[in-house]
Amino acid sequence: MMRSVAVIGKKCLHRHTVLLKGNPRTTLCWERSFAGASSDDCRENLSRKVLQDLKLDDAIGLFGDMVKSRPFPSIVEFSKLLSAIAKMNKFDLVISLGEQMQNLGISHNLYTYSIFINYFCRRSQLSLALAILGKMMKLGYGPSIVTLNSLLNGFCHGNRISEAVALVDQMVEMGYQPDTVTFTTLVHGLFQHNKASEAVALVERMVVKGCQPDLVTYGAVINGLCKRGEPDLALNLLNKMEKGKIEADVVIYNTIIDGLCKYKHMDDAFDLFNKMETKGIKPDVFTYNPLISCLCNYGRWSDASRLLSDMLEKNINPDLVFFNALIDAFVKEGKLVEAEKLYDEMVKSKHCFPDVVAYNTLIKGFCKYKRVEEGMEVFREMSQRGLVGNTVTYTTLIHGFFQARDCDNAQMVFKQMVSDGVHPDIMTYNILLDGLCNNGNVETALVVFEYMQKRDMKLDIVTYTTMIEALCKAGKVEDGWDLFCSLSLKGVKPNVVTYTTMMSGFCRKGLKEEADALFVEMKEDGPLPNSGTYNTLIRARLRDGDEAASAELIKEMRSCGFAGDASTFGLVTNMLHDGRLDKSFLDMLS
């Protein structure tokens, strides 16, 4: 069988040229040891302890002395040295030394041939690996399972997966017992080549042939199936595996439960969870994590809380990642009471204290639901526990205060952030500018903006758009336009929001021609207009009483797949009521 594989390669080994000159300082001790050395001296110098501490230069020097000694050390001694060099990943040197041995008439054995085969497989030079296998077998050496595993790995990495499968089948036919390395190597290769069904078939075929894969092999196949989104096949394989008297462990159950939860097979996941407990397999944190997360995703908050309580009663302590993910899930759904309870559980457990991420999540939740003072309380508690807030912490609070129209406290938090040595990033500054502008503090925003420019901060388009809008709303449309025109010089490209903001400024000032010109420029050279752009211009034309221009814009907007927004509908409805518009406008928008 192996002869049919090995016959592929018949070429001689490529000649490697390596200068065997070690560093005189590092090899001196070896040279002294082998001055007039016998093969017994070699054996002593190749003890396990010496080889463990061997450096490359010393190994080269030692080889030089070994080939000078008479009689030559045995091939076993040479094998030990070559193996030590191979462990240094110096395979080119191993090949070169092997060639020198051959030229000196030192015959290789099974072990050295296996090293060479492993080298060529790692280098994806399979034809040379097969040539050595053929030569080895011609000399009467049958390959070991280690050698065949090297060849198998070479086939898998060399995109010759069908030959890898055939090799394993032939191994079984010839009486070899594939080990864990054999199976896992082939399984990983099959999954890398999107051959999941063949991986399952391989396991089933091996069982029929009386070559039972072990738990590790089943685990590799099940893991691969779940990663590919086929947890139902993994579940079937688990059932077959257990019928074959191979008991799955908690890792395999966790893998399938996680896969079932990810792909929304929640009932199957809980059935498996119950089966697991019935069989006496104790669940751990990795069992509960996907189940609780899945319940949260389906909005089954009370069930999630019950399962969490069950977990804690069993003294299964969630890790920080689990707690943080769960707190985040509660916060996103507005379940702040549940999030606080979970936080309290973290503190009580004493196994897992809240970190900055947990505090930031809670603060974000309070700020999102306009409870920024409670967010500040969490921040103070965090500081009392010795944790220092990061950029996200302060930025979240600043944003929260601005949303609550509390401009003074927002600025106070910003000042505290700077005094605490936490560096604001561009997002912090953008939120500060936006908050100041929206609260009527444009002059303060301009001071901050000027400071940012003087510090050579890398301002983004959000920064510039915010300031253009603020200037336009403050009646400084010319200054807004100057800033817009400077963007190209700054290497910043305006986006659709920037164009729309500038057009809105022109329209607010009654500069209809400038708005039209910018709209034309936008369609020719800039980003494509969006719904906001069209609705901004339509409302401006309606306010000017230009029904014809409004109608044309509505038609163009609809042809681009956009519709009127709430503000435009509101304006049209009001104008219909007081008789300034015909009902046809409403029909055009709908």
Curated annotation (Swiss-Prot):
PPR repeats: 74-108, 109-143, 144-178, 179-213, 214-248, 249-283, 284-318, 319-353, 355-389, 390-424, 425-459, 460-494, 495-529, 530-564
InterPro entries the UniProt entry points to: Pentatricopeptide_rpt (IPR002885), PPR/CCM1_RNA-binding (IPR051222), TPR-like_helical_dom_sf (IPR011990)
Main location: mitochondrion
Domain of life (superkingdom): Eukaryota
Pfam family membership, one: PPR
Keywords, in A-Z order: Mitochondrion, Repeat, Transit peptide
Protein localization: Mitochondrion
SUPFAM superfamilies, per the entry: HCP-like
TM regions (residue ranges): none
Transit peptide residue numbers: 1-34
An example Gene Ontology CC term for this record: mitochondrion
Assigned protein family: Belongs to the PPR family. P subfamily.
Record NCBIfam families: PPR
Protein name (database record): Pentatricopeptide repeat-containing protein At1g63070, mitochondrial
Organism the protein comes from: Arabidopsis thaliana (Mouse-ear cress)
